Amino acid sequence: SSAASDVYKRQAVGNGGIGILPWKEPFSIKQIVLNHVFDAGAPHEVSRLIRGINPFSMNVKVDGQVVDGTHISGWEQCILLKEALHQTRFVYANKLEVSYNICALRSMPYAGLVQVKVKALAPVDLSVENGAEVPDEYLQPRIQRKSIQDYGLHLKLLRTSALTRHRNLQVSATSAFIFENDTKVEESDNKRNIFTKYLKTGEDFSFALLGAVCSQRDFIDPCNESDREVIYGAKEGVDRLMDLHLEQWNELWKGDIQIVGDDEAQRAVRFALYHLYSSARSGSRLSIPPFGLTSQGYNGHIFWDTEFWMFPPMLFLNQGIARSMMDYRTDRLKPACQRAFSYGYRGAMFPWESDDVGEEPCPTFALTGPFEHHISADIAIATWNYYCMSRDIRWLREDGFPLMEQVAEFLVSRAEQNEDGSYSICNVVCADEYAEGVDDNAFTNAAARCALQDASKAAALCGIKAPVSWNAVAKGLRIPKFSDGVTREYEGYDGQIIKQADASLLAYPLKAITRPEEIKRDLLYYEPKIDKSGPAMSYSVLALQYARLGDGEKAYELFVRSFRPNQLPPFGVISEGAGGTNPYFTTGAGGLLQMVINGFCGLDLTDNGIKQLPSALPKHWKKIIVKGVGPNRRTYVREQQ
């Protein structure tokens, strides 16, 4: 929660379909984010996640004066994580107590609800006006009003539709006021819906604003569909909508983490879980971008962040969301194969950034698009891990192995054989993106080796004989080393500052390095090399390894470095790097959660299922409880020794 603050960084509510970003001004909603709905950012430029038409805009007046940031006392906002509600309270001009909640309805992925309660502290005339705000990425907005009086409904619908500026995608937003008792809604001079109410001293009054935002990505006729969603929700009633919303969030929270003895860590972990849950949903066949549904950061594209950082905690705690994240990739296997073909390779070459069609939308000024090839291996590894958790052999045969097979073929065609018989992957951008155009990046090669080995195991389970080349390349891929045994990030690396963890990923999650002394050697070497303003997840993966090595205090030191320097007021949302200003960084949330689940609690996914490895807790933690793990929703506990 937060009192009034000059520095204000957003805290969104989301349901996996839309994200709603409330703001600090009374009744203000900054923007709506639509999951996986794209337009070009500019003529002939790459795709960018679009902001939705905002149907929740309200202009509230008390005795003819607009309720804005002035004459406000007792201002407080909080995010209720369990209920996924954004709550604001204040007193206006000593005349009106106000409380309102904003939520993205979990039971309706394209709808949101604003519930308002007021109490008159003096006799007041209240007027509330609702309209839609149309972002500048749209053309030709059209406003339509419709009256619904049937089956006990008395609704005044307000619909605003428009086309996106560059690709002519139609988006429609509809809203309607809902009251406990009959209240007359009229049309204002500027084609908005408005109602007025006289309140006596001590009188309570409440109303709700229901809105839906639909697009041609999901509906052939988004205009009528946004109307239908509001009509349906109004007929269900506010109480039932909220009951269903809370019921579905209660189900999500069955996958939970409890930390006994550290309230700060508990809040950070629950905040991270909340943001992943609110950015995705089971059955959507969609994935999570680096900033979830909180902004247009990184154009809303899907990166390795998904499979490497956000997918693992969802795989442990929510099978439905994990499956949707997998579906996102298997649905886009064909364009990945076409991309490999266009670059002269075999198999499937997944794009570094992915939008709805699964082609490469990375801006052309960035070399990551054509050269950061570890992404294909990362996706194949996640595919095998999904099978190891689910044990769904039918899925493996029909969806998983076909993807793994095509990635294996790409990796074999991408590798080059050296004169000594070893194999190299040359001219890549590393996970450490400060390193461009290098040969034999340790992480890229180790990930490729892991993906090839996993593909061979999957082939055997599917009754298919794996090509000999898969094993030959996997065995022969070079992993550079310094003379003292430290993993060398790439051939020619000589101690430069790195953007983020790279060689350190060989111990976890790749398990390419397993001896404790080798893991410790790499940790000690690379920790001081990490750019202190780099992405948040680097320190979490180092912390995880220290926890497994038995050093709980060092693990804790790095754990808090993965989120404390990145927290922003007033809610403590985290940015990508220390000093950043664009929250919420869901990739960092994924790293933080892996630190707790797989580090402090010691859970490890193997070919044969989940094992709990030895691990150490910080001294002030009493125990950690991870609930709802895997298909059987098991509970794991690690107590202080």
Regions found by a protein language model. Give the residues of each.
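C-terminal capping/lid segments that line or modulate ligand- or cofactor-binding pockets
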Residues: 6-37, 309, 361, 417, ...
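Short, mixed-charge aromatic SLiMs
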Residues: 39-48, 136-143, 295-300, 331-339, ...
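Helix-terminus loop motifs that line ligand-binding clefts
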Residues: 280-294, 320-381, 387, 394-398, ...
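Active-site core of glycosidic bond-cleaving carbohydrate-active enzymes
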Residues: 302-332, 381, 385-388, 398, ...
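Long, charged, mostly alpha-helical binding arms that flank functional sites
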Residues: 251, 255-260, 264-279, 427, ...
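Acidic/polar, glycine-enriched structural segments that form the non-catalytic walls/loops
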Residues: 1-13, 17-23, 27-30, 34-298
